[in-house]
Amino acid sequence: WIMGHMVNAIAQIDEFVNLGANSIETDVSFDKNANPEYTYHGIPCGCGRTCTKSEKFNVFLQGLQKATTPGDSKYQEKLVLVVFDLKSSSLYDNQASDAGKKLAKSLLQNYWKNGNNGGRAYIVLSIPNLAHYKLITGFKETLKTEGHPELMEKVGYDFFGNDDIDQVAKAYKKAGVTGHVWQSDGITNCLPRGLDRVKQAVANRDSSNGFINKVYYWTVDKRSTTRGALDAGVDGIMTNYPDVIADVLSESAYKSKFRIATYEDNPWETFKN
């Protein structure tokens, strides 16, 4: 999965997919009542990018729905996965459940169209703080109460705080999560970061008793870093330059080992060679 970083305006969806992304990451900011408000990152946001593009969250979801609904004039067949980078650090820990409930309602109405031919992309809820695990339970409860528990088949999870992997496992246990787990590791593209924790996450993914299904590394803009991440065995790379990642994937060392994921590739299944 080539994951376009910080896609917060509807116009950027086409821009990133046309450069080779089959997945996008979108920032979600919350108001003080835990309502998802804008797709907005804010300053600072990494090197070489404008940090302030934004839409109202529900408006962005409507644009995203069109981009991921077959038959729509805006449909982008290649876009199969969306990571919502939830900026829930602005909330109190005890608001996490409310944030999850309100996020589920927004998605249900504006993206899934209440289960009536909505967008088809898989969704990853990416959470900054292990203490916010109730965001997951609130989200799940709401889809159930609203009569659409089947949509949870389209939803996965990620904690992106670079926490100790054993601690991440405990948070999922509390949230009652037993699958659909993506594990991110990374740092802003302005700074270097080693691959030690990525390798730990990959080892967990590939062990018989691991809880991780997929591992992705962020934010990668250089060919050399891309090669390092691929050599470590990641499933996804988040980038400001999807074309750079696509280029490296076409190199002879990688093209027989990796391919670009399509809608038929289940993002919740651990890949077995």
Curated annotation (Swiss-Prot):
Q: Which InterPro entries match?
A: PLC-like_Pdiesterase_TIM-brl (IPR017946)
Q: Which cellular components does GO assign to this protein? A: extracellular region
- What are the EC numbers? 4.6.1.-
Q: Which reaction(s) are listed as its catalytic activity? A: an N-(acyl)-sphingosylphosphocholine = an N-(acyl)-sphingosyl-1,3-cyclic phosphate + choline; an N-(acyl)-sphingosylphosphoethanolamine = an N-(acyl)-sphingosyl-1,3-cyclic phosphate + ethanolamine; a 1-acyl-sn-glycero-3-phosphocholine = a 1-acyl-sn-glycero-2,3-cyclic phosphate + choline; a 1-acyl-sn-glycero-3-phosphoethanolamine = a 1-acyl-sn-glycero-2,3-cyclic phosphate + ethanolamine
The cofactor(s) it depends on are:
Mg(2+)
Which tissues show it? Expressed by the venom gland.
Task: Reply yes or no: does the keyword Metal-binding apply.
Answer: yes
Q: What is stated as this protein's family in its record?
A: Belongs to the arthropod phospholipase D family. Class II subfamily.
Tell me the function of this protein. Answer: Dermonecrotic toxins cleave the phosphodiester linkage between the phosphate and headgroup of certain phospholipids (sphingolipid and lysolipid substrates), forming an alcohol (often choline) and a cyclic phosphate. This toxin acts on sphingomyelin (SM). It may also act on ceramide phosphoethanolamine (CPE), lysophosphatidylcholine (LPC) and lysophosphatidylethanolamine (LPE), but not on lysophosphatidylserine (LPS), and lysophosphatidylglycerol (LPG). It acts by transphosphatidylation, releasing exclusively cyclic phosphate products as second products.
What protein is this chain from?
A: Dermonecrotic toxin LdSicTox-alphaIB3aiv
Q: What is the lineage of its organism?
A: Eukaryota, Metazoa, Ecdysozoa, Arthropoda, Chelicerata
